[in-house]
Each structure stands twice: as structure tokens, then as C-alpha cells.
């Protein structure tokens, strides 16, 4: 979903409609209902609900249920342990028996609400990990004093063992620090759950490059609806479909889509919904394209919806899509403005400052409307876009057109909620009263126009060269695409055509949008980012790129001037016409970058202008914003649509407006949880890290370094259960040379040589991951006549063999590569396990033998370098 996000700093200036009579709503309705951390929670109304027919209401109700059934998918996509964390929080909130009035518990509630808001443990916008302002000890007491039956425990797992796993996931500041990272290898340093196994960026590119067809005029969206998995060195996709990943949730979505189809308004809706069901059933991306083609050609229906894996913003590679849904119906009043714009799409395309090679010769099927949303879900909830343009496939947009919408009731809710706050970002960051007056007079009109231009025409403008593959800009594609659409809107806001078409009242109007945009891009949006952090979110990068590029290019002519008054920084536009020219120049360049697939120039633009933040300016903005007492981010509670039953028959559907954010999410957790939580972290088998193999009778190469590397890995993955496999030989063991074997005496029971290296006791941070003979030490070779290189049948403290005690996914390290490590690995591999081999954590008897063994193993398992 090419989308535009509300900027809360100017929300008080916006209105849902720019002309005409306001739709009937409850004038006493309270919009702002909760504030915590850096967030505010609002409600939105559904005007004109009573004007819908019973059939239309029923259709919306079923579509809304389909939307809510996919809720868990997004949380799981955002991070593999999000559902485990969320269900733990839900269990505490629903069953904790202790004091709920103390400050610690209230701080816990704030954390829980933040996790619900962000659909996971990472901030929904900044993407860094959030932490509860409570101690680990207090958290443990919350868990232990809650109903264990409600906790997401694995079969046979104790509460204490579960705490060993979940505590570092929540509290460790270095573990899973960023949902989507731009540092070094963007796959390995990101926590999004689109990739599993030790996969790097190059492997992802090679996997999908091998699938793409050269000069394909109608390419599918490769990788859009799947997780890329590396198992035993081989890559494959787990596809999201009925009999695949997220199958249970998808079954529920399909159930409600079928119910909706029974009461659809027309055959067009039934047709594209059936195609969507086929796509969900098969996972076939050609079916996805067929659905989008049918969907985009329906511009007549009153009711519409989006339901699927749509946007790739969260994927570091810009390929894999998060799940989202909205349900809506047409706002007839607001649609008039949008229809004027879409009717003139060809004029805008022909007159843009873009190279003619990159312009569409014919703009097809451009439709635009204002909509009233009734249900938000997935990546649109609780923090939704205010504008949408779909579908995303460039060839479908070129050949069949696109749908663009402005969500009018959400814009109205943002506006009304901002008016309930006493202070204004505008008054703080605008340089003059003249600027304030200009924005108060025209921002509501200009911003809605910019949103329409951005969504209706901006994303749909231009074309790729025939030789350019979609997705060529990779991790920079989202920021550059949003910048391209914003620039299109900014350039045309100032065109006299807007007044000629009757959309703007005069040529002063656009100046309000220019000042708002530059002020936000250079300054006010920085209030949303933690000090010292970079800009990572695509829309924020887009605004920063445009603003700082124009500031730099306009320095010679003083187009945008940086002023300081009373110790406060301001940015003032001195020449609006020249600024429009700069917008046009940058639009032309970014269109060229996209059309030609110029990755290096796209990278340069984003990295130069859209990532780094001036620390002094950042500190100033944060201090000024904090003094206002406003929250920089906002989201919503959904209305509840409830059947009204009389005489056993549904006679109406009533809209209720709940005001408790926490309760809504707890209710959703009880009624719409269809994805199993995952806390089956890989188990780490540490083989024979014993003194005799390190500095004793059988001292091995790289052994000391291997100990250091294994400890480092364990500390970087504290949630992974560690199992220590050890030789445990009697003094007369048959493997010893004195008793007919080939080895010197080693690892004898009760000797230093048979002890695990002390670093695993002293340097491993998580106590649960240290060696403990009562818990995680498995012994082999304990019988006189048993060689037993492999740990597969090593015996644990409860008498069971290791093969009976571990899950499918294993990490293996230890000594020695050619013998005990290889034999352990091969037995588990042959038993169907997925193996990752920690290469730096290996010691060896002979370097040549190690190298030969690694050549063999690299072909059959995944290696961690």
C-alpha cells in the first residue's frame, strides 16, 4: 500500500473535508481517550452509517471479522517471539493476583499497551526495542503469580524454564535490538521474521535473482507472501497459505470472506473476492495479480476493502509484505475533489518536470475517492495511514490503473483530537505570526490536496524502462517511492491548475503546505526519534531527504533560510517559486533513479540526506517538543459493529465506540488469536569443551579461541537453551591406548581434564545457560567398552537420551570437528534435524582434517561464520 502517514505535529490544522456541509456526527464525542509513553490513543466515528442498507451493513460486518482474524499474523511477522511476549502480557493482565495499584504494576501496564500498539516489542515507527520500566525480579513475580494455564508454555515446560527464555527476550538491551536495521548486513541485523536461519543479504538477492525472468513485462511480486528459510544449507520458501504458514488464520479470513460474498453489493465484488480466496488458498502470486487487476477495475461499488500481504516497508530488502486490512465505504462528498484530480491525470503526467522517457503515454484507470473506514487491522492498526494507493505492481498500475483513497473520518479524528489539546506544535516551530496565520487559514485545504495528489497521481505516475526490474532499488525503494509521490504532490500544489479546477481558492494556499512540509522535514519530526538514533522509517526518510536536499541546493539563493531567535532554530522559506523549482528538479531525478533502477544514486540520496541527524538540532527539537507536553505518535481504537437481534433474526448492525484501548486488545487476544506463538528457539549443543581437549592430553587446534567464540555466541543468544555434551570416561576406557584404543588417556571421570572449561561458568551471562549437572549436562562414553563419538545418545540428568530431549532446530559447536562434532551432527541430521554449525566455535585435532570435514559439512548444513 503506497500510503501517506499523518504527521501529528500539524494534525490540529487538518479537517476531513474541505468544502460542503459536515457529515452528521456526535458533536459531544470525545476523540482523545488515552495517553502513555510517546503515544496518544483516539477514537474515530463512522458518519453516514445509518444511511447504509441492512445488506451493506452486514457486508461490512463480515469483512470486518475477516480483517480482525489476521491480527496475529502481523505480530509474528514483526518478530518471531512477539506472540509469546504478547500472550505472556495477556496472561498477567487477565489473571495476576497481586497488587495492581502499585507503581511497578502501572509501569508494566504501560509496557503492555506499548507492545499492543506496536504489534510487538519494537517501536512501531522508530523500530528499536522497547523496555518495561520494571525490574526483572518484579516481572518474574508477575509471571509466577499469574495463572500458569494462561501462559504460553511449551509442552512439559516449567514456569521457571519459561522465565529463563522470555526474560532476556524482553529485557536484554543488546538482544534483538532493531526490528529493521540499516547497519552492515541488513538481514542478519534485523529482527523481522521474514527470514529464518543464518541468511545474508547476498543469499537473498541470489535466490530471487535466479527466479526472475529477463525482460518480463508482467513479473510477479517475488517473495511477497513467504518466509525465506535456510535449513541445512538449503534455501526454500514457506508460503503464507491455507496449508502453509499462517494457515489457521488464513482459514478464518477465508471463512468470513465467503460469508461476505453472500451479501456483496455486486458481481464485481464477488469475482475479485473469489480470486482473493483462491490466492489465499494456493499462495500463487499470479492469482494475486489476477485479484488486483479485478479489484482495481471496480470503481463503482460503495463498499471496498483491502485484505492481504500488501506493503514491503518492514522488510529490509523491500520485497516481503506485512499483512494488513481495512474495510470502508465511499465518502461521496470528499470523492468529488478526488474525481476532479483523477479525471485530469493525463494532464498532470504530461506536464510534470520528468524526462519524457519516464512518463506514461496513457494514464489508465486512475480512480480516486474519499472513504470512511469502519475497521482497521494488521499493519493499519492501531496506527493507520490517512491515504492509500494500490495496487503496488508497476505493470498493473500502467496497464490497468490504480485506486487512490483519502480516509476522511480518520483525518477528521486527528483534527478533533488535536483540538482537544491546549498547546500547538505550529506555534512553537513557526517563525512568525504571519506563518502561523497562513497555516491556520489554509493548511487544512492544502494538506488534503497534497494527500490526494500523493496517492491518486504521485504513486501512479511515471514508468520503468523495459530493461528495469521492479525492486531494483532494494532497501532504499520505500523511502524513494514515498519521496517521489510527495514531490509530485508538492510540485503540483503550487500549479495554477489547482485554482483553475476549483480545488484551491487562490495561489496563497499552497504556501501553507510548503511551510508545513519543510518545517516538519527539517525539524519537528525529529521529536519522534530517540536522541542519538538515525532516521529509519521510510516516510520520515522521505521528508528529510526532500527538505535537506532542497535546503542545500537552495543555499546560494537563500531559498530556505536557517534563523536563530532567542536561542531557538527556525527554517523560513524566502522564495516559494524557486522552492517549487527545486521540488521539480528532485522529482525528475528520483523518477530517473526509479525508472533506470539506479541503485547507487538512490543509495547516495537516502544515505546523504535522509538518515543522519544533527545532534545539536535534535536535542533542541526534543526539548522544545517535550515542553509542549504532546505525544508525537497516535493511533486508534476500532468501533465495535454489533448485530442487533430481534426474534432470532438480525434486524440491524449497531456501532459502539469503546474507549478502553487495553480492553479492546485483550478482547482481540481472546477472540482473534489464530497463530501459534513460537518460543522454540534453537538449542545449542556444545560438544566436549573439556580441558583435556583444550590444554591437556588431547589439546586441539583453535580450542582456546573456540571457547571464547562459543561463550560470545551464547551471550548474544541468551534465549537459546544450551546443552553441554561431555566425554565421561572411566579410567580404563577402551579408547585409551593402554587398553587397545588409539587415544591417550583423556576426560576421565572426576578429573580436571574431564571438566567443562571454567569460562562457561564465569563468563556466560544468563545463569540458565551455564553448565548444571542437574539440568543441561549430557554424558557419553561412560561405559568401558563404548567409544561413542556422537552425543546423539548421550544421557542426561533424568536418564533420557539427548535425542529424546531436543527440538528440530540445533546449533552445534565444540571439539573436535573431525570426530565428536561431525558424528553428533550427522546423527541429528539423519534424524531430520535442522543444523547450524558455529564455525568459529570449533576446535580440531588436525587442521587438514578440519578443512576436509568442513568441505563435506558445508554442503549439507548451514554454517555460521
Where do the model's predicted regions map?
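C-terminal motif of bacterial Sec signal peptides marking the signal peptidase cleavage site
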Residues: 14-16
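Long, well-structured alpha-helical subdomains associated
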Residues: 45, 490-593
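Active-site recognition of the HExxH zinc-binding catalytic motif
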Residues: 53, 266, 449-463, 485
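An active-site-proximal "capping" alpha-helix that borders the catalytic cofactor pocket
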Residues: 53, 266, 478-495, 707-714
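Contiguous, non-catalytic segments that form substrate-binding/exosite surfaces or channel walls
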Residues: 110-229, 236-435, 443
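Post-HEXXH active-site segment of zinc metalloproteases
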Residues: 462-483
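Extended, compositionally biased alpha-helical segments that mediate assembly or anchoring
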Residues: 579-678
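Active-site acidic carboxylates
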Residues: 677-779, 808, 833-836, 845-858, ...
